[in-house]
Amino acid sequence: MKTVVSLGQIDAIVLTAGASKRLGEPKALVDIHGESLIQILIRKLKGKKLRIIIVTRVELFNEMEKLGEKVVINTNPESGRTGSIQCGIKELESERCLIVPVDRPGFSNATIEKLINLEKTSCPSKNGRGGHPVILSKEDCEKILSSNPSTPLRDIINPVKIEVDDEFLHLNIDFPNDLEKLRKITIEHDL
């Protein structure tokens, strides 16, 4: 981790390094009514004054760089999501961070607000089932850095579950029909 700028500042690590094989196109770049999914997430996170770190694969670097945020390449994205999180943690300027997978956009602004005001590693939960994004404590950031990049995050940390009302918390963009559902939801709801 880099030198801490402010104890109150929180960085958001947006994960975009996945291969998107099931969807057939890069999830970060899918069009949602004239805006890419990554643009929607950045706007939502910037609204909470979070510093953005985008972790991506080499093939998407140029597109991600156009967004004007800090971009880091995971040179081995096949190793798993934890490896991408490690890449982002190494660039932190805050002690805590919010982990935001690009394919899990169903959280509300109220959920972000709840999470960034918590000190312990926590995640939103709907009906007892945890979701994303996840806020990481300084201690858990250090645990993740010392872990194998292929170790699933759930085997490294144990987030406190915070029950939220987000109807679409568990929306996961993996297949074309998920994308159509997201497009419909964004018209009908404030995501």
Tell what function each PLM region has.
Residues 91, 143, 185:
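Active-site catalytic microenvironments for nucleophilic, acid-base chemistry
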Residues 2-12, 146-191:
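Conserved alpha/beta core of the MobA/IspD/sugar-nucleotide pyrophosphorylase nucleotidyltransferase superfamily
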Residues 112-156:
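Flexible, gly/pro- and Lys/Arg-enriched active-site loops
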Residues 105-106, 140-142, 169:
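Short histidine/acidic/glycine/proline-rich micro-motifs that form metal-
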Residues 7-124, 130, 161-166, 190:
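Nucleotide and nucleotide-moiety/phosphate-recognizing core
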Residues 100, 133, 171:
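Glycine- and other small-residue-rich loops at beta-strand/loop junctions that grip anionic moieties
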Residues 106, 135, 172-173:
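Short aromatic/basic micro-patch
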